[in-house]
A protein has these predicted regions:
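Substrate-binding/active-site clefts of carbohydrate-active enzymes
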Residues: 27-34, 39-241, 257-291, 298, ...
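Structural recognition of the beta-strand scaffold that forms the well-ordered cores
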Residues: 34-39, 92-97, 119-127, 155-159, ...
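Active-site-proximal helices and loops of the catalytic beta/alpha 8
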Residues: 145-154, 164, 232-338, 342, ...
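Short proline/glycine-enriched turn/loop motifs at strand-loop junctions of beta-rich domains
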Residues: 475-480, 551-557, 625-629, 636-637, ...
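Structured interaction patches on ligand/partner-binding surfaces of diverse proteins
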Residues: 496-511, 681-713
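Aromatic-rich carbohydrate-binding modules that target alpha-glucans
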Residues: 623-673, 681-700
Length: 713
């Protein structure tokens, strides 16, 4: 996130319809994509008439001397460069928040104008920013971009920031609008649309990170019925305009429980992919366990910050070794159920660009090759392929957002991205496969991706001077001679693989040159046994559509089962099936595909009872706790943990800003009568149940809900 006429209408509607019907339609399956992150204002000026619009005049600097002003990039500019993006192998673009942003200048400490060029101070989430589109805040430019992207085989992800509106102490004072109608602002908040708790002081406090203010940005109260409906309607509006996914800004700071219902609302409306920004340095972060529990259960994947830290350390420093990356992968993979949906990256708009911390193109190429071949969904920050960076003040905000000035298609980084993007399309090992470290020292990392018998083996030597002899290497590649897939782009040797057993075939000793990256690969021939590589979403209620992706499904429809119950098949192809979740018991079910007599592997899917409603549960005068003890909620539905009493299984921990009263927002099934109780989980794991009968509550059919009970002694 950012720190601090009739004919025209007809054309717009036509473009929107085209974008919806010609969408790449595998939006729920992103595992084989290459995402390209764009700060719209800094990419390309495709329409000079929107640079200084009347309703927000004076915020544009054509000289580009003021780094906190608008510089002219717009949606038309991205559309104009669609062939450039497609030529690089980009299959999805993540654009900065396109919603109508702050209209007023808030001078910096030196009196210089500042603007919300980055998009993270939304004032109207149902209109398009005039600097990005046109003076009427219409959707025309956005619809045209989506249509152009889809016709180029590129998906569109919008950055969505439901945590806050605009600055709360200046400018428009957090004012928020609903398609032009004023709803309220932070300073005159009689409706309670905002939280008023001051700025976050303790970044490891669960209550503060969700309910306090992020850098003076008016913190929205998503538990308010109006704000809940508003944000979900805004997301659905983007879906109506053809977007394929959402990058949810600052998920660590938006009410965690409410976001389950946001994701469910999106998935109920249509095919999509969601991932969020949960900033953390590494797996020792105090809230790391909260991050993986959120990702495992909410339906929202995350940006892989722990791996990002390791990538920047290993490739950005002369002293760090590949053990950092190997450890990060091991620790993250052990905790995240859907690790292949994590979005991997080298840098982004909130940190110095890689070349600002290590101005070495060889190291950048190695980091790029690693990101494009390791587990997860790779995301490339705009300009990386052109070696774009500005090192002023260390290259941090705003100097990590320079103007894109070159669009060369001949750079090594551009062609490396293209080459490995093509491999992600042709070899399922990169999108769906396991990842195994095969050989490692401080400078060399050799790892293998494998999906059934399709294999990709990658070797990286980051030493600038030492060639390493590689002996004792084993691989799942079949016996044979393999040339470097990256030949002509990056240097690397061929290898010879002998016959072994158990997926451990010996590689003849070879030398891995300094500053080299080599990729060797094998694609298994098509067969008749279905192979599931992905399902999306991973959680939902009966009736919701689920995309099952993989290979060998055949051209004739077979059977998709959730547990032992057959699902209604909506569409079927050899690599993709869309089916509706059948009426089965809530909880984890195994999805399988049957083709003739052949049955696929199974992938887990969490079945909910109904669409989700955010409900705030409060328990008063709970049993006393000491440091390390927490109150949790558990109950008779999968959403409440099915009476689980562990940290990872129960729902919580709850928040206690007015101890001994505790509260927690949880998304639960609409219209259902649920049973629940509160428990204390002590620091040593001991569980204390409240006494008495189970509490019962009838969840509203829509909107939001509130429960307020006393602890039963």
């Amino acid at each position: 996130m950012k720190r601090v006429s009739g004919r025209a209408l007809t054309v717009s509607l036509l473009m929107m319809i085209v974008s919806l019907t010609s969408s790449t339609s595998l939006a729920a399956d992103f595992k084989r994509e290459v995402i390209y992150q764009i700060i719209t204002d800094r990419f390309f000026d495709g329409n000079g008439t929107n640079n200084n619009p009347a309703q927000s005049s004076g915020l544009y600097d054509g000289s580009r001397a003021n780094w906190r002003a608008y510089w002219g990039g717009d949606l038309q500019g991205i559309q104009a460069k669609m062939s450039y993006l497609a030529g690089m192998g980009v299959t999805a673009i993540w654009i900065s928040p396109p919603v109508d942003n702050l209209n007023l200048n808030i001078p910096d400490g030196n009196g210089n104008p500042t603007a919300s060029y980055h998009g993270y101070q939304g004032r109207d989430f149902k209109k398009v920013e005039e600097h990005s589109g046109d003076a009427s805040n219409a959707w025309t430019a956005f619809d045209n971009l989506v249509a152009a992207a889809h016709s180029s085989g590129i998906k569109v992800i919008v950055d969505f920031a439901p945590n806050h509106s605009t600055q709360d102490n200046a400018g428009e004072f957090g004012a928020i609008y609903d398609n032009g109608t004023f709803l309220g602002n932070f300073t005159a908040d009689s409706n309670g649309y905002f939280h008023h708790n001051g700025n976050i002081m303790d970044w490891n406090d669960r209550y503060q990170v969700q309910y306090y203010t992020l850098f003076n940005l008016a913190d929205i109260n998503q538990e308010h019925a109006t704000m809940d409906a508003y944000m979900k309607a805004a997301a659905q509006l983007f879906q109506q305009h053809g977007v394929d996914g959402f990058r949810v800004d600052a998920v660590k700071h938006v009410t965690w429980g409410w976001q389950y219902s946001l994701a469910n609302s999106v998935y109920t409306f249509g095919d999509s992919f969601l991932f969020g920004e949960w900033y953390q340095g590494n797996t020792s972060d105090p809230l790391f366990s909260d991050s993986y529990r959120f990702a495992n259960k909410s339906g929202i994947s995350l940006l892989d910050f722990p791996l990002n830290t390791a990538i920047r350390n290993v490739f950005g420093s002369a002293n760090a070794n590949f053990g950092d990356i190997d450890t990060a992968l091991t620790q993250v993979n052990a905790r995240f159920t859907w690790k292949d949906d994590l979005v991997t990256f080298i840098d982004n708009h909130d940190m110095a660009r890689f070349l600002s911390i290590n101005n070495n193109n060889d190291r950048l190429h190695q980091a790029l090759a690693f990101t494009l071949t390791c587990r997860g969904i790779p995301c490339i920050y705009y300009g990386t392929e052109q070696y774009l960076h500005d090192d002023t003040d260390g290259g941090g905000d705003p100097y990590n957002r320079p103007q894109m000035v070159n669009f060369s298609t001949s750079t090594t980084a551009y062609n490396l991205t293209k080459k490995l993007s093509d491999l992600r399309k042709s070899n399922t090992a990169l999108g769906y496969g396991s990842m195994t470290q095969r050989w490692m020292n401080s400078d060399v990392y050799i790892y293998e991706r494998k999906f059934y018998n399709s294999v990709v083996l990658v070797a990286i030597n980051k030493s600038s001077s030492t060639a390493y002899p590689i002996s004792g290497l084993f691989t799942s590649l079949p016996a044979g001679v393999y040339s470097n897939y990256l030949a002509g782009v990056l240097s690397g040797p061929s290898i010879t693989v002998g016959a072994g057993s158990g997926g451990n075939n010996p590689v003849t000793n070879f030398s891995l040159p300094a500053n080299s990256v080599a990729v060797w690969q094998f694609v298994e021939a098509a067969g008749t046994t279905p192979q599931i590589g992905s399902t999306g979403p991973t959680v939902g209620q009966p009736g919701i559509k689920v995309t099952v992706a993989g290979r060998n499904f055949g051209s004739t429809a077979g059977t998709v089962k959730f547990g032992t119950t057959a699902a209604s098949v909506i569409s079927w192809s050899d690599t993709k099936i869309v089916a509706a979740v059948p009426a089965v018991a809530n909880g984890n079910q195994s999805i399988t595909v049957t083709r003739g007599a052949q049955v696929s592997n199974a992938i887990q899917f969490t079945v909910l009872q109904e669409k989700l409603i955010p409900v705030t549960f409060t328990v008063n005068n709970a049993t006393p706790t000491v440091m390390g003890d927490y109150i949790f909620l558990t109950g008779n539905t999968v959403e409440l943990g099915n009476w689980n009493t562990t940290w990872d299984g129960a729902t919580g921990p709850m928040n206690a800003p007015t101890y001994p009263n505790w509260f927690l927002n949880v998304s639960v099934p609409a219209g259902k009568v649920i049973q629940f109780k509160f428990i204390k989980i002590a620091a040593n794991g001991a569980v204390t149940w409240e006494a008495g009968s189970n509490h019962t509550y009838t969840v509203p059919a829509s909107g939001v809900g509130f429960v307020n009970v006393n602890w039963q002694y």
